Amino acid sequence: MPRKIEVVDYRPEWESMFKEEEKKIKKILGKNCIGVYHIGSTSVKNMPAKPVIDIMPVVKDLSLVDSHNKEFEALGYECRGEFGIPGRRFFAKGGDNRTHHIHIFEQSNQTDIQRHIAVRDYLRSHPDTAAEYAALKKKLAAEFPYDNDGYCDGKEEYMKSLEEKALRWQAKQNRLSTGISLGICFGAAIGTSFGISFDNTSMGMCIGISIGLLFGSLFGSMDRTDSSGQK
């Protein structure tokens, strides 16, 4: 019988399960590993999810990962290769009682890396969307308890829309962060000039940085459009 699809309430131990596995993965991948990220629904606090920890290691060179297959197998993982996504190495642990998935990407593959990070961070920052997505998954799990294709197909359109919103939101957050950083630098320069002019460096810096933060925030919040008018 196929593996049963279950969506359960959030479990605090998911974070510690990730951290425990993170140490093992870093030890296996060694210096090739740049970072290991907890992704998927189990990485979003208070969000119901399938009780499978999704882990995304990022490496310098993906071609070196296959040489570690025996080490991953020793930890209980099945090595599945790309498993439908070019540029990925996928590992599954737990058999029919699945507990972990590992999705390894090379650092040059920012498209896949950023879409995973963007969705995670968007759901963490938008609890209403997280609740909506969880409700959809619970509905699909009840409708397709032993049909993984039916479950995945049922949320495909929602996930596409979610990824698009998450990536736009992430881009805006990045612009805002850049704008604020530039504003602080610009404000500090203005503040120094004010301080020298009025013989009060502290006051000048406060005024300058405040002005810089204001303009930096406005700059970072501006919508960007391309030549076709698309954001």
At which residue positions do the language-model features occur?
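Catalytic cores of NTP-dependent nucleotidyl/adenyl transfer enzymes across multiple folds
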Residues: T111-Q173
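Short amphipathic alpha-helices in soluble, non-transmembrane regions
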Residues: S67-L75
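Conserved catalytic core of two-metal-ion nucleotidyltransferases
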Residues: G76-Q110
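Helical scaffold of the NTase/Pol beta-like nucleotidyltransferase catalytic core
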Residues: M1-Y37, K160
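Active-site nucleotide-donor binding segment shared across nucleotidyl transfer reactions
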Residues: I25-S63
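Short, flexible turn/loop "capping" segments at secondary-structure junctions
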Residues: M1, N46-K50, I113-Q114
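Helix-termini ("caps") and immediately adjacent flexible loops/tails
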Residues: A171-A188, T192-K231
